[in-house]
Amino acid sequence: MRCFPQLTAAALLLATAVPGSAWAGATFNKTLQLQGTNFQVQSSGEGSQQQLTITTTGAKPAIKPIRQTVNGQVVGAEVADLNANGLPEIYVYVQGAGSCSYGEVVAYAVIKGNEPSPITLPELTGANAEGYQCHDQFQVVEDCLARRFPIYKPGDSNAKASGGQRQICYKLKAGEAGWLLRPTSVDKF
């Protein structure tokens, strides 16, 4: 299954690396809404660390604000209900500094009550990690979180991968200690 064979130009722009000089004072500010809950996602700061703040309105009971430091720049955010439980999740995409631009997802599930529950994205391992050298792109597509990145072959430069693209679709599952994004399908093209 291909979650998104064609990325829109806007999604590509969100996922591109930011040159070092553009990092000074970089900010992100976006309001998202799902199932009656509004999420305000903001980041600010200088250098390779940003302060991420997520606040909500409309949830009953009110959800506690989330504040954390992220390594990189916030480049996008989406809300979804990947597990179809009637409660939204927030997915924030962070791009690391430097030419490699490692991607990270900071995500939280709204649970009954006012404490947001962290969602964990596992490290790439095994065959999924073969040829991986960063340049991640993330996007919610239907009921999965899709992660796409170029595949590098031995001898490829950081600027030119020759092995195509790998896309991994993750489904949201309940784990023993919280929510997990588990890989359910992998495509190469």
Predicted regions and their residues:
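Short glycine/serine/proline-enriched coil/turn segments at secondary-structure junctions
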Residues: 97-100, 157-159
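Flexible low-complexity loop/turn motifs enriched in small/helix-breaking residues
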Residues: 23-72, 111
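Beta-propeller fold detector
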Residues: 65-66, 117-125, 181-186
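Beta-propeller blade repeat segments, especially FG-GAP/WD-type strand-to-loop junctions
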Residues: 51-62, 102-122, 169-175
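Repeat-based blade/solenoid architectures
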Residues: 67-76, 126-133
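Beta-strand C-termini and the immediately following turn/loop, strongest in propeller blades
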Residues: 44-45, 93-96
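Acidic, small-residue rich beta-repeat scaffolds with periodic aromatic anchors
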Residues: 3-8, 13-17, 22-38, 44-47, ...
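Residues in Ca2+-coordinating acidic/glycine-rich loops
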Residues: 34-35, 80-88
